[in-house]
A protein has these predicted regions:
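Alpha/beta catalytic cores of nucleotide-metabolism and tRNA/nucleoside-modifying enzymes
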Residues: 1-21, 109-112, 177-178, 184-185, ...
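Bateman/CBS regulatory modules and CBS-like beta-alpha motifs in cytosolic regions of diverse proteins
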Residues: 27-51, 58-60, 89-129, 134-137, ...
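Surface-exposed amphipathic alpha-helices with a cationic face
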Residues: 44-48, 73, 98, 121-125, ...
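Short beta-strand/loop segments at the ligand-binding rim of alpha/beta enzyme cores
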Residues: 48-57, 103-108, 171, 228-237, ...
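Catalytic cores of alpha/beta
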Residues: 67-70, 244-254, 288, 294-312, ...
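Glycine-rich phosphate-binding active-site loops on the catalytic face of alpha/beta enzymes
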Residues: 74-89, 203, 256-268, 308-326, ...
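Catalytic beta/alpha-barrel core
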Residues: 80-85, 109-111, 131-133, 176-178, ...
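Active-site-adjacent beta->alpha loops and helix N-cap segments on the catalytic face
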Residues: 86-95, 156-161, 206-226, 244-247, ...
Length: 478
């Protein structure tokens, strides 16, 4: 027989924060958003792995690839590379993040010499970048034969079918540097020759990287970036409950710092088996999150099974239709509040703190602050990050407005993988996600900075300088 709750569940949109006393020290510049990512024991000096900002990007094809992971790690958060791809491809993305050299950009705008001005304009419209590498085969690491920038053509005076080879700046007229050039040396060359960009090539003239003048300031040390002990960017990776025996070792070998089981419903034997395998093979050296759950029982099940963090939320995502298709889920605010209470009780009883992640239901920036105040240690976002330049999808023009493609892991586009499978027939018989578009919003850095400035300001209004204080303030007045 079904259990009936006495009260309906609630979403973030049904709540507002009541302001509290703000001391003279309570200003945004003094607010710390550092938060634990994985579990730790009482008395431990510090959490084994923490975030500098409480934001992580969702385990989705349309959100988290290596480019997103690098951009978010620079800001202090972490991306979980999507697992709905081959093991080899996911491991390669992880490896690219771990081997990334800050300041050295792999070109994402490349054409061959036989392409036309029309192709250049379409590529610029798609990527938003005005510097296009011309390589023999049109690939990012092909033999460099020239470069096209906006100074190389005038649309009003040229035919769209003009070959790139006729108006590009040829290689012999370019200032280039060796692929082993240091960032400082590259920046010195840029300033000495008044360049906007400097291509780095190997001994065979194959393009390796670009260094851009506009990125100079961002190459300076960013005190908020999330680095491992070897000064490499921290990156996560999604896994499923089917091929984990092969996928997990490959991702660990590639350098993944933390894993997360990607499933719409985590209160299951399949997740326990996955956690059991990882603990038996690696002990506590491999950090892995699990989920999703929406209540106390689900949290305790995963915490006792060995999860390093637990994701909270079912059906709350903007492109998730699990609630419509199955009639399961829970209002995100209610789910977070209940699971946070269970986490605190578990910590009091065992001395083990298992962080929770609110996944889904964030529509406005202030919902982030609410999620933190209600007890979430960090927040997983899909639609939010899908809007940015760094997401892996195409930017398209729809009725005069720029949009980014966005689809759910339960959609037909991603349905051949295991996120929504409970076992048995591998073919998914119905969708739990949809294809959509989200308004293009520009760069990740600018938007994350704006969103977090709102979070810090609101925390000051509530008299809190740290997330845990924010939660305590809310609980004391609830």
């Amino acid at each position: 027989m079904a259990f009936y709750f006495s009260e309906p569940s609630h979403t973030f949109g049904e709540y507002l924060l009541v302001p509290g006393y703000s001391s003279a020290e309570c200003i945004p510049a003094n607010v710390s958003l550092k938060t634990p990512l994985v579990k730790f024991k009482k008395g431990q000096e510090e959490c084994p792995l923490s975030l500098n900002i409480p934001l992580v990007s969702a385990i989705m094809q349309s959100v988290s690839d290596d480019k997103m992971a690098i951009a978010l790690a620079k800001e202090g958060g972490i991306s979980f590379i999507y697992g709905s791809q081959s093991i080899e491809d996911e491991a390669a993305m992880v490896a690219r993040v771990k081997s990334y050299k800050a300041g050295f950009v792999t070109s994402d705008s490349n054409v061959s010499p036989d392409k036309t001005l029309k192709d250049i304009l379409e590529l610029k419209d798609k990527t938003g970048h005005s510097t296009v590498a011309v390589t023999e085969d049109g690939t990012a690491n092909g033999k460099l034969v020239g470069i096209v920038t906006s100074r190389d053509y005038r649309v009003s005076r040229m035919e769209l079918d003009t070959p790139v080879s006729e108006f590009m700046t040829k290689f012999e007229n370019l200032i280039t540097a060796d692929a082993n050039t240091s960032l400082k040396e590259a920046n010195d060359i840029i300033w000495e020759h008044k360049l906007n960009s400097l291509p780095l090539v190997d001994k065979d003239q194959r393009l390796k990287y670009f260094v851009f003048r506009k990125d100079y300031s961002s190459h300076k040390e960013n005190t908020n970036e999330l680095l491992d002990q070897h000064k490499r960017y921290v990156v996560g990776a999604g896994i499923n409950t089917r091929d984990y025996e092969e996928r997990v070792p490959a991702l660990i070998e590639a350098g993944a710092d933390v894993l997360c089981i990607d499933s719409s419903e985590g209160f299951s034997e399949w997740q326990k088996r996955t956690l059991d395998f990882i603990r038996a093979k690696y002990g506590d050296t491999v950090k892995v999150g699990a989920g999703n759950v929406v209540d106390r029982e689900g949290f305790l099940f995963l915490a006792k099974a060995g999860a390093d963090f637990v994701k909270v939320g079912i059906g709350g995502g903007s492109i998730c239709i699990t609630r419509e298709q199955k009639g399961i889920g829970r209002g995100q605010a209610t789910a977070v509040i209940e699971v946070a209470k269970a986490r605190d009780e578990y910590y009091k009883e065992t001395g083990i703190y298992v962080p929770i992640c609110s996944d889904g239901g964030i529509v406005q920036d202030y919902h982030m602050t609410l999620a933190l105040a209600m007890g979430s240690d960090f927040i997983m976002l899909g639609r939010y990050f899908a809007r940015f330049d760094e997401s892996p999808t195409n930017k398209v023009n729809i009725n005069g407005n720029y949009m980014k493609e966005y689809w759910g892991e339960g959609s037909a586009r991603a349905r051949n993988w295991q996120r929504y499978d409970l076992g048995g027939d591998k073919k998914l018989s119905f969708e739990e996600g949809v294809d959509s578009y989200v308004p293009y919003a520009g760069s990740l850095k600018d938007n994350v900075s704006l969103s977090l400035s709102k979070v810090r300001s609101t925390m000051c209004n509530c008299g809190a300088l740290r997330s845990e204080e924010h939660t305590s303030e809310l609980q004391s007045r609830s």
